[in-house]
Regions:
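Membrane-embedded transmembrane alpha-helical bundles that form the catalytic cores
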Residues: 1, 5-238
């Protein structure tokens, strides 16, 4: 499930960035759609960083017209449940998408009215683990075809499956691709971006040459992968 977590992030964030880049080529400026969501320390923060365009649309055209948070507690809870029910339904008229949306709606309500003071007192690493675990469970609901399948995945995640946390095949695949997985985890954090920006701001480096070399290298690598790949559509193209 951690691999699914990374796949959907790089899949969706990747083609969102491609759209932003293509827009720039034609003189259009598009807002960032993903802001390193997997560094979040709460689900509330996660949804400020994940699929920002969708969250902003539902906020502006559904949540605020319903009264937003300028209403009573009961009505605010109602507003959140309506927004997240519709967010799930936006992805498809299937139980798993609706359950996924309501799952996040309930968590956001609990964080707002119960957990927020508790989370604020916890160490950052604990809050981060809390966020990642809930997000991964969310992806289980999103991709499962039945409640039974979702329950089986969640049991295995917590070591309650027939083979514990993973069977031999899963462990083989994990160890065989461990370096790639670590690169993906590292790439989903802002560390590379911050380091690159720091280097560009340093007077020791010629930013024009650095940008040209980096972009050319990335372009060559991308073309090489495209040439060797078969047809592999983006996961989010169906939404």
């Amino acid at each position: 499930q951690m691999c699914i977590r990374d796949r959907i992030y790089f899949d969706f964030s990747g083609y969102s960035d491609m759209a932003i880049g293509l827009g720039k080529m034609f003189g259009f400026e598009f807002n960032m759609n993903f802001n390193y969501p997997y560094v979040s320390k709460s689900i509330t923060e996660f949804w400020r960083r994940w699929h920002i365009s969708l969250s902003s649309w539902f906020r502006d055209y559904v949540y605020i017209p319903l009264g937003g948070n300028r209403v009573s507690k009961i009505k605010h809870i109602r507003n959140l449940l309506i927004v997240w029910f519709l967010t799930g339904l936006w992805h498809g008229a299937a139980w798993n998408f609706v359950a996924w949306g309501l799952y996040y709606g309930v968590i956001l309500i609990i964080e707002k009215y119960l957990l927020s003071p508790v989370l604020d007192r916890l160490p950052d690493v604990v809050r981060h683990i809390y966020s990642i675990v809930l997000v991964v469970i969310g992806w289980v609901l999103f991709f499962s075809s039945s409640f039974g399948q979702a329950a089986d995945y969640i049991r295995v995640m917590f070591g309650a499956g027939a083979h514990g946390f993973a069977d031999r095949e899963s462990m083989y695949l994990l160890t065989s691709n461990l370096i790639l997985w670590l690169i993906l985890i590292f790439g989903s954090t802002p560390l590379v971006h911050f380091r690159y920006e720091h280097m560009l701001r340093s007077k020791k480096w010629n930013t024009t040459i650095i940008n040209s070399v980096v972009y050319a290298a990335l372009f060559i690598v991308c073309i090489a992968y495209l040439v060797t790949e078969t047809y592999n559509p983006f996961l989010y193209f169906r939404f």
